């Protein structure tokens, strides 16, 4: 349906515009900054889908007696994860008259608003692996992204979720740090080096709690004069994501992006096409489209809990 003058009369009534309209259209309300790029691996793609394959490394070496043959092992394929790109787009059509009478240049900025709509969608989609990480968002082992029993291809299990979900506190965060040291394993069950730099991703409701926990020099919320080991033993970056839907859930993501598998593949970037004109009506048409995929090809380097 084309934009006509009657559907937005305030733009064409030849009187001073309401200040609320001015605030929206003239940029006094600012767009939310991008959040997902702070912790996602953002990569470009030139294929219709991307496939990530993990592998099972060698087991431990075996005792070998003098003159005896060596024990041999093989590298094996682990799990496979496909990222299938989806296309999103939006169009805007305006009549010739509405375009001509656009005294405030609102209609001519339609391309900017279309790009904003695309960015807003991407930000929301990028929050889904965390929002759905305890249910429908799965890793290649078929289990939820945050789970207490991830299946290792070489045998055994590992977890990246508290055994009993807990609200964010100094004690629950300390337990998460312990769990990441005992359960960050490769597919053969080998323990990985402890991750010492973390991004703590939280909803706005936990911002002040998180700041007290990770930035207090002394133990927060106690009368003890002990130092705060959460601050002294780890490096933290608190990231507030307003697109998280659970006000109690909190997440840990490795500060070094190469140590986790949260990935955003960009097949076609946000593209606003040049303004077109309908030859029959002379209506102006503007469209935008983008193709991308989002997910986690491994649970390693992440940790999450739903809260109590």
PLM feature spans:
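N-terminal alpha-helical "arm" segments
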Residues: 1-28
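Sequence/fold signature of self-assembling virion shell proteins
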Residues: 2-9, 148-185, 196-199, 205-308
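Assembly/oligomerization interface modules of large self-assembling protein complexes
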Residues: 26-88
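Structured alpha-helical segments in the cores of large, soluble enzyme domains
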Residues: 74-84, 175-189
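Glycine-rich, often proline-containing surface loops adjacent to acidic residues and nearby aromatics
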Residues: 85-100, 157, 194-199
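Short, well-structured alpha-helical interface segments that form or flank functional binding sites
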Residues: 87, 102-109, 113-116, 195, ...
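Alpha-helical scaffold segments that mediate packing/assembly in large oligomeric complexes
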Residues: 97, 102-109, 116-179
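Surface-exposed acidic, glycine-flexible loop patches that form ligand/cofactor-binding
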Residues: 135, 186-193
């Amino acid at each position: 349906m084309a934009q006509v003058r009657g559907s937005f009369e305030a733009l064409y009534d030849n009187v001073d515009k309401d200040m609320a309209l001015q605030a929206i259209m003239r940029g006094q309300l600012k767009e939310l900054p991008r959040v997902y790029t702070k912790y996602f691996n953002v990569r470009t793609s030139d294929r219709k889908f991307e496939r990530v394959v993990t592998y099972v490394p060698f087991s431990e070496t075996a005792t070998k007696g003098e003159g005896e043959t060596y024990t041999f092992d093989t590298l094996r394929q682990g799990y496979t994860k496909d990222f299938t790109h989806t296309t999103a787009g939006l169009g805007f059509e305006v009549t010739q008259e509405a375009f001509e009478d656009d005294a405030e240049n609102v209609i001519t900025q339609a391309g900017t608003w279309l790009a904003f709509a695309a960015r807003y969608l991407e930000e929301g989609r990028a929050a889904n692996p965390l929002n759905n990480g305890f249910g429908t968002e799965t890793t290649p082992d078929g289990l939820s992204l945050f789970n207490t029993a991830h299946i290792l291809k070489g045998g055994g299990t590992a977890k990246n979720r508290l055994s009993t979900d807990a609200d964010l506190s100094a004690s629950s965060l300390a337990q998460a740090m312990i769990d990441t040291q005992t359960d960050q394993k490769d597919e053969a069950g080998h323990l990985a080096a402890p991750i010492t730099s973390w991004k703590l991703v939280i909803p706005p409701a936990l911002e002040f709690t998180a700041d007290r926990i990770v930035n207090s020099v002394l133990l927060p919320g106690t009368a003890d004069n002990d130092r705060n080991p959460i601050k002294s033993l780890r490096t933290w970056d608190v990231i507030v994501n307003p697109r998280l839907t659970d006000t109690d859930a909190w997440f840990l993501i490795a500060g070094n992006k190469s140590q986790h598998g949260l990935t955003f593949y960009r097949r076609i970037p946000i593209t606003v096409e040049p303004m077109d004109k309908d030859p029959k009506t002379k209506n102006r048409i503007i469209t935008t489209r983008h193709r991308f995929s989002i997910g986690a090809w491994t649970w390693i380097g992440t940790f999450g809990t739903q809260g109590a």
